[in-house]
């Protein structure tokens, strides 16, 4: 039946009992993808073995607008229409190569699709850098220049108005995604003002050299606290965390160190003049790591290792982070990133055609199941080989619910039966016999043992 087809996983899926997070990250901040495309991506990622999809709703561009966008900053309230309009203008100022924003109802549909597919969503809303559209809105609405030294994408973390506006903005999204049941929230925190400082130690070096790095640590910790208060785990990229081995910094008389509860997506060990702390050192400092090694990026509009096929995935190792092998206890997951640096370089259909098999190869590599002759069949509800959206009934997880049970006794096993509410498929689990629980009692000098459960 059609219902049974809906509950059958496609053949390319590979089940794993590991707790290792397998994340497919989509840069949907720089480039807008249609709602139907995102739903297909969710089905594709699930079929390819991923446990999570990370949606970059805010990364340079801001592609998701809530129904209520109103903000109150410094005692002044900005209407929902004013904020939404400013974000749209900011998106247009960032790029005219891609346009559009998802509505809240569309995002709700993404979560419904993810639930059907059996995959989780991790939001990414980058701050204090990579926030061109939000920075544009902050400056235009408040009448204050919120930029750090002329950066078009990074707020000044020493500017109170910039900080309060950005944090009020993020709080709305933290609340929304926590309400959808998300367990993680990535606020990025990478490449501070690297558009303004394009060589050497770049933006983080500028912060440190000017004595302002403490403001950055303070800001990052405040975002982490916001996320934790909402019941989620904070995530950030690695390069700004203890940059150049600077473990702490001060604002006035207060010294700040980074919150060790932040899970670090380690993507780069740096380059000439740009010296993030090593993955090994961050792990020894107590940070948990997600292997985000940049050599495995797919970057729209740039040459990368997946432009001509998927076999580069054979080089992946779950616990080898930017060339350094770490312990399984330090590395809690891996992430394959599809960045949209040049959003107009390809249409979404062209991109789907190019990423379909690398996405699958990397998912299988994270499961230790990659082979050069992997199954290349089309995923129902995912993408066709030409990049168009497949319209076959998509795979989804069974919605099993308890429908019958027999209690176990001391000597006889019990059982619990579960039935899928969608297709009727069922299975039964055995509950082992409990065994006698004898208690001793004195009876006129004799010791009598009686089972407290059945009386034997």
PLM features: what roles do these ranges have?
Residues 8-17:
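Sec-dependent signal peptide cleavage junction
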Residues 19-20, 60-116, 131-161, 178, ...:
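Aromatic- and acidic-residue-enriched carbohydrate-binding clefts of CAZyme catalytic domains
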Residues 31-45, 275-278:
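Short, acidic/polar
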Residues 37-61:
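Catalytic domains of carbohydrate-active enzymes, especially glycoside hydrolases
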Residues 48-50, 106-128, 152-186:
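An active-site-proximal structural segment forming one wall of the substrate-binding cleft
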Residues 158-263, 267-287:
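Active-site neighborhood of glycoside hydrolase catalytic domains
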Residues 249-393:
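Flexible, acidic glycine-rich loops studded with aromatic residues
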Residues 392-456:
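Extracellular modular ligand-binding repeats in secreted and cell-surface proteins
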């Amino acid at each position: 039946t059609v219902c049974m087809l809906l509950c059958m996983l496609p053949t390319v899926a590979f089940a794993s009992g590991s707790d290792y997070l397998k994340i497919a990250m989509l840069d949907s901040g720089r480039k807008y993808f249609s709602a139907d495309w995102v739903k297909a991506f969710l089905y594709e990622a699930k079929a390819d073995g991923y446990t999570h999809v990370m949606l970059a709703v805010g990364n340079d561009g801001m592609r998701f607008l809530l129904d209520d966008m109103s903000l109150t900053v410094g005692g002044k309230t900005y209407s929902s229409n004013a904020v939404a309009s400013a974000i749209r203008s900011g998106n247009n100022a960032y790029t005219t190569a891609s346009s559009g924003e998802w509505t809240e109802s569309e995002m709700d549909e993404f979560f419904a699709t993810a639930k059907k597919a059996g995959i989780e969503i991790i939001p990414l809303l980058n701050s204090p850098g990579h926030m061109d559209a939000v920075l544009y809105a902050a400056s235009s609405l408040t009448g204050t220049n919120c930029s750090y030294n002329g950066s078009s994408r990074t707020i000044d973390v020493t500017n109170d108005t910039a900080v309060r506006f950005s944090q009020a903005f993020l709080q709305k999204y933290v609340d929304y995604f926590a309400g959808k049941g998300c367990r993680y929230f990535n606020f990025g925190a990478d490449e501070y003002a690297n558009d303004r400082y394009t060589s050497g130690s770049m933006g983080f070096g500028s912060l440190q050299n000017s004595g302002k790095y403490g403001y950055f640590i303070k800001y990052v910790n405040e975002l982490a606290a916001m996320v934790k208060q909402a019941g989620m785990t904070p995530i950030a990229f690695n390069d700004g965390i203890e940059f150049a081995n600077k473990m702490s910094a001060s604002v006035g008389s207060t010294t700040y160190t980074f919150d060790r509860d932040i899970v670090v997506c380690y993507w780069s060990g740096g380059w000439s003049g740009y010296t993030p702390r090593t993955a090994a050192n961050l792990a020894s400092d107590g940070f948990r790591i997600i292997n985000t090694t940049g050599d495995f990026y797919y970057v729209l509009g740039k040459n990368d290792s997946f432009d001509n096929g998927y076999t580069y995935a054979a080089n992946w190792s779950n616990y080898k982070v930017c060339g350094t092998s770490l312990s399984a206890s330090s590395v809690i997951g891996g992430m394959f990133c599809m960045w949209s640096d040049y959003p107009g370089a390809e249409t979404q259909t062209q991109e789907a055609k190019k990423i379909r098999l690398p996405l699958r190869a990397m998912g299988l590599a994270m499961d230790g199941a990659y082979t050069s002759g992997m199954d290349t069949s089309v995923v129902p509800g995912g993408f066709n080989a030409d990049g168009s959206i497949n319209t076959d009934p998509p795979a989804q997880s069974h919605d099993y619910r308890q429908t019958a049970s027999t209690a176990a006794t001391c000597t006889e096993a019990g059982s619990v039966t579960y039935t899928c509410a969608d297709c009727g498929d069922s299975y039964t689990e055995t509950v082992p016999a409990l065994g006698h629980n004898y208690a001793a009692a004195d009876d006129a000098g004799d010791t009598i043992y009686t089972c407290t459960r059945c009386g034997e």
